[in-house]
Amino acid sequence: VQETQVKWQLLNLLDNKIMQNMNTKEYTIDATGQTLGRIATRVATILRGKDTPGFRTNIVADVRVLITNASKMKITGSKMKQKKYSRYSGYPGGLKQPTMTQVIEKKGYKQILETAIKGMMPANKLRPLILKKLTISE
């Protein structure tokens, strides 16, 4: 029993040291001419920290990502008219399903990109912490 406790204590020390030694790495991604899905997958990988050698699923990577020119990204196919973003208020008749065009008019390209990236993050307590490290400019 004591051996396993010592192992866990050592692992915790290593985690803390890794986090202290990591410098915040900043990425700037220009979205001009790139497709929505390609940008989203690249950013999701960076935000999770999967491209670093010290990747741990339970630790938020010390990274910041800035996406510029979001309004100049390419949206291929007929997604503008056919893609729908659903949200439900919880009340009868409270299901809203605006198309991509309607969301862009109301909230901008930032919302589209953020939703795509959010869908690629794990659905747990780390998701909001990871998404805080993302900045999108139109």
Segments predicted by a language model, with ranges:
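Ribosome large-subunit tunnel/peptidyl-transferase-proximal elements
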Residues: L14-T115, M121-K125, T135-E138
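Basic, nucleic-acid-interacting segments
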Residues: P128
